[in-house]
Amino acid sequence: MSVKRSSVRGPGSGYGYSITHNSTAPTYRAASTYGGAGGQGTRISSVSYSGVRSGMGGMGVGMGGSGGSMSSSIQVSTSGDTAHIMGNEKFAMQNLNDRLASYLEMVRNLEQANGKLELKIREAMEKRGPDVNDYSRYNAILDDLRKKVFDATTDNARMCLQIDNARLAADDFRVKFESELSIRQSVEADIVGLRKVIDDTNMGRMNLESEIEALKEELIFLKKNHDNEVMEMRNMISQSGVQVDVDAPKGQDLAAIMAEVRAKYEKEALKNQEELKAWHETRITEVQSVVSQNTEALQGAHTEINDLRRQLQTLEIELDSQKSLKGSLEGTLRDTEMRYNMEMESLNKILVGLESELTNLRSNIQQQTQEYEHLLNIKMKLEAEIATYRRLLDGGDFKLQDALEDQRTVKTKVMTVTQTLVDGKVVSSSTETKERNL
């Protein structure tokens, strides 16, 4: 009859115990213990004790990672012959001593390998751990990008300000143009009125000139009529030969009377002529003064019209230049917005790339943390197997309870630290702790 229990394995490594009982003699067997880290493995062969006859199997220890292997075996059998038993025990003790020396050497090698492995794990954690991540190489790129964004924003604001200033200047020029246009229209209306006044003045002047001509003709006619009357009077006097002697006082001389009448009429005609001439000159002076005033006003109006026309042309030129400036500024604004959008897209792509890289770094950190936990688990299991092997070599009894007690629970605490970096500074940090049994 035999009872066998075996195969209790953990993740990444395996170890098992089996106990076999025979009906004739009790036999205790410690089964093989497997443990490995990477390509390394440790195997402890079974050892059996019998009440009458004992046999101790071979024990072998091998390391695949170090490229070396050792193996030794012991076969001890007892019989009724005590001397034969003592000789076998002596030989077995020598073999055990040799195997113990080999085992201790293997333990030292394993400890050195564990030390190297821990050093590599520590270096990997220092290089790629969350607290040692160095993102300073991105600070220059981010500063340059921030500077470009700030410059683009400043240029955009400057362009908007220039456009607003140009729009305000265009509005001012439009108001000024409208006011100048109203002034021009009022001046043109005044010019039309002045032209009417000039036409009326010309008509009055022509009427006065016609009146003067009529008066001159009337004066000539009066002079001619007067001369004719004088000639007729003289002829009548010369032709009349009648001489009347009157016994009366001597009257006035007719020639003297005629001379007096002639002088009187000539004086009145001269007076009328002078008055007419003075009145004509006065009217002409008044008309000339009015005409000169109207001419000066007309010349001033023409000058003002020319000035207004020049100002209008200047304003139209400035308006065209402002329109062209506005068009160029709008084109520059569109180009700036397009360039700004392109830069923002490139920055977003860079940001997405950095975020993906950060995600990859975090996943690598998590993966290495899991690998570290796995290696730590393997190390602890190796230490447990070494302790069990030492206890077996020291001659301690091996029981099923001891094998089961070796299967102690190992709890692993995983601490995840999440940090948010802005401008190379930590703005938020969160810690998540998880415990699990190994």
Swiss-Prot record:
Residues 125-141 are annotated as: Linker 1. Residues 396-438 are annotated as: Tail. Phosphorylated. Residues 2-88 are annotated as: Head. The keyword Coiled coil applies. It holds the Pfam family Filament. SMART domains: Filament. This is Keratin, type I cytoskeletal 18. Residues 1-21 are annotated as: Disordered. Residues 258-395 are annotated as: Coil 2. Residues 234-257 are annotated as: Linker 12. One of its GO terms (molecular function) is structural molecule activity. The lineage of its organism: Eukaryota, Metazoa, Chordata, Craniata, Vertebrata. It comes from Oncorhynchus mykiss (Rainbow trout). GO terms for biological process: intermediate filament cytoskeleton organization.
